[in-house]
Every structure is written in C-alpha cells, then in structure tokens.
Amino acid sequence: MNQALQNNTDKNIVLLKKRALYYLGKREYSRNELLQKIGPFAESLEITRQQVDQTLSELEEKDWLSDKRFVDQFVFSKKKKFGLKKMGYELKMRGVDEIIIHDALNKIKSEEYDLAKNI
C-alpha cells in the first residue's frame, strides 16, 4: 500500500515537472511566477510545498529556470517602454531577488551612459 502511494506521488511530481517545462517552453519565468503558475496544479495533485520547491530547485540546477535569464529578457523587452524605476518595481512584484534586479538595472545605466557619451 505504501509503495503504491509513493509511486502515485512520483507520477504526480513528473506531471508537475512536465507542466513547469511546458510553461518554460513558452517564455522565461521567475521562480516566483512559475510557483504561482503551477501552485494550483500541485495542490490538485496533493503535492506538498516542499516537493514543489524541490522540483523548482531541480529545474534551476539544470538551468531550465533562471531568475537572471528572466530579468535579462524582461529588461530587453521593456527598456524602451519603461524607465528604470518602473522596471525595478515590476521585477520586485514578480518576486525577483533584489541583487539580480540591481545588477540588471546598473547594466542598463552603464549602457545608456556609454551611448550618450559616444554621441
């Protein structure tokens, strides 16, 4: 009986991982965004938060999930529409680490400074 329960849990974790990879195949997500996206699905499969966190950590270890890559893509797509403060706020609301946000925004500042200097 216990073995059957373990097999069912393992199958559910595989389903959760497939769902996460499906979303990541469409676009980059921050860890927090992906957690919000797959959270209800995990609950319906009766997967614990700890198991979800382990799954997300595994995706990060395999470099399929990356907050830095998400930030780089976000900044690239929004830098013509948003200012630095707006981008910083949006990234913070998406649960991205402050250090990653700070590094990305500093990179933009230095690029803008170099462009202005060359004009």
Residue ranges, per PLM feature:
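An alpha-helical, amphipathic repeat domain used for nucleic-acid recognition
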Residues: 1-119
